[in-house]
Amino acid sequence: MKANRNQKINRICRKLYSKYRKNVISLVTAVVLLVTSMPLADISGFVSKMVSTVTNAITAMAADTYTDITNDIKSGVFTIQNADDFKKLLNADPAVYQNITVLFSNNQSQFKASDFTGIEKGLGNEEYPFMGTVKANEGSAINLPINFALFEYLSDSANLDTIIFARPEEKNSALLAENVIHGDVASANKWKIKADPVDDSGATNYKSFTSVIGNMKNGATVDLDITLSNDVKVEVSGGDNAGLACGSMDENTSLAVSLSSSSLDVSGKSNAGVFVGKMSADATLSIDKCDALTSVNISANNAGGLVGSAENAEINVGEGVTLTMTGSVTGSVTAGGLFGSYTYSKANEKTFDISKFSGMEMALACSSGDTADSAAVGSVFGVLTNSADSVKISITGTANDTITSNFNGTVRAGFYGGIVGRYSANALSSELALSDVTVDVTGSCNSTDFGGLIGKIGDNSKAYVSVKNTTISIKNSTSSQNNYGGLVGYADQAFIDVGGKVTVTANDVSANQSVGGIVGKFNKNGVVRLGGETNLSGFYPKDPNKNGCQIVGNRGNALIYSLSGWSFTRTSSKVIDDMDWGGVLRLNNSDLLESADSVLSFDGSGHTVTINGFSNNNITISNRADFARAALIMQHDSNDFVKYSGASKADMLAANISLSADVDISDTGLTGFMRDNGEDTFTGTLNGNSHKLTMTVGTENDKIVFHTHNGLFAKTSGAKISNLKLVSSFNIVGDNASGGDACYIGSVSAYNSGALTIDSVTADATASPSGAYTNFVGGLVGYVADATSEVSFTNSAVTANLTYDNSTTKVDCTCLGGVIGMVGAVTSKPTTGIKFDNVTVGGNITDKHTGPKSGSANARVGGLIAEIGSDISSSPNIVKIQSVSVNTLNVKTSTKISGSTSGGFIGHNWYNVEVTLDKIIVSNSTITSVSYTHLTLPTIA
């Protein structure tokens, strides 16, 4: 005990002398000046002698505190035969034994834990780390039942025989060494460490320690062979950074590990992993051997199956080694099957081959607490950060190796991902490439955002992510509070590039906000670029809606397009949209090209798309590439991902457009010029110059179900459309939820508010909505709102083939009008109102709904305007019919409830309207109705 106390005094003296040496010199000088009249020239020599005297006194006192073992070292060997010998060495000066050989004789097996009571620190110190040899007599082993690390400071140049530790009490200390520093060694010496769970009484018991090595200092190189008893669970805990092999690895350290064990608990405050708690820049962990770990539990702020957190670190797995591990990883900030958190900032490419980790089947979860809502959980990385510029990180596997994402989400976390919980990048020019990855998601998670590959691409992070040859199967109940994506749950701003064969399977998935087979939600800008074969036949939301979609649930301002040859297999289990607005722009190898002189071009290094813009908003469209260019600019602001020069989006929404040739945009994925969600309004002009424009919206390739504004122009105000031949087909379900947005369909304009001029337009319009909720369908305009300004139709002809194809609905929710579906109430009395002059209407208008078994049901149809609505307190609408020809128009309705009514050649119910009727000619037209009342002319009130 005295030696140990003296040892502490010695260390304190040394530290005080080192720290306050300059103060001693200053003090002595000041005293001399105050109490003597000594000449300045003599003061320097006197002070030097005084300081030397103080120094010698401190040195002598320090030397006296060590146990002298000089005479015990024989030919460089210190022999330990009993506990007293060992304690004598522990209390000796590290400078004396730094390079000696410590020989444990066979008598050391008699050590007991009680022999070392009160000893807290092992051999070596920062100034004199142990660099010698520790060995046992031949045929014997080194058994140490100690509660402290054998070495306080150990050099990686030291040679150690196999050491068997038995930790009798729970202590926040390492097993072998608190610190390992780099010595003069070319390659790592192998250190064999075993854990013996036998205490003084012979009971099977093992107490916790923080790690085998606490901290590896800069440049240290270690090769550890660790054997833990198979029948006892070892607990690694108590440190800020906890890992069985090492708590923390400083920069440029290297650790090789061979592990024989089956059961392990690792818990740390900040970082915890089976092998290492924290790895600093350029640290390397090599796993040369690892038995199957069948009962492992890891917990910390940043918890990882292998490493808690790492920066620019390298993990190598030996040839023929595949890691197999079951148990749990629970993090309050991050939880990852391999890494809780990983940051990469180097200039060269980084590759993670995850095929070696296919046996990692840890149950991943977030612990409860204040950080849960922002916590990230992933089967490989909880959080992955690319903080470099223009650097590629690759995550690759093989088709035969499956990564299992076993989520145990009893506590709601921020983000869950099949590979990465949350990813962020410093630059769009960098890349995260995932290829040849097979992911099985099992268990359940309760997350804000969930993705089959990435839960969330971080806020304000501009990231490029490529996905190739990947299969994702989400098998059990995985719910998302907000957004759910087959590849990415939530992308603040991201470019998702999909190629090769990509298959996503997830049945009846749900989220409060958005569901998509590729991306759940884009918050701001982004791009989805589709190539190869995309199979989403097994992916569908439980309750399809306008944001529960096949490809992207909420696309925000994202551009979505496909390359030539892209094949897409959709689900047949549900009728759902591809995305919440628009469709996939389908490029080809003929006229819609990914090239600078066609529609758009892709910068493969900067990861941006440039649309071939227009110099101003007086534009001529001569082919469908021109149409696509104009449409893309109307739909997208120029941003970091999608760029163009010249006319802006605002300019294009007020453009003067002319056709110089016939244009067919069918099968391009374009649904018109604009976003079909009613977000923007066209106020410009379109002169067709007697050319034909053909469009088909809602094909087998591009399903349209919940899109609200469907037409050449989604929304107009003050627009002028003239000299155009328009052939349009709208295969739209129009099944918006009850109480939600209505569906508007019109070949020219889905929804108009304000003035509108349609002159010399010939339209052949086909539409067949079948949804059970509100649809306003018109041959030219779906809905006219507040017609206080003039809405005129002149010198035009419409062939309207409109069918409400729902015989089971019990509500009369759909208006079918040959020219206008419905006119809303006005806010003030119009001067002119709605005018028809020299307009011809023909075609087939069919309402198949029969209504409820009792009550009333009306067929809201009409050859001109199906219905004019009214607010009781509003001013009347004005309709002027100067010259209208109803020619070869067949109206057929199916309502048959007592009291039901059916519209006819002109309309159904026109409320609060002043009608000026000059000339109507009806010829070759029929009305077929099973309702009790049908109206050749509308009911005008």
What are these regions (language model features)?
Residues 1-46:
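Gram-positive cell-envelope targeting signals
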Residues 45-935, 941:
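Surface-exposed repetitive/solenoidal architectures
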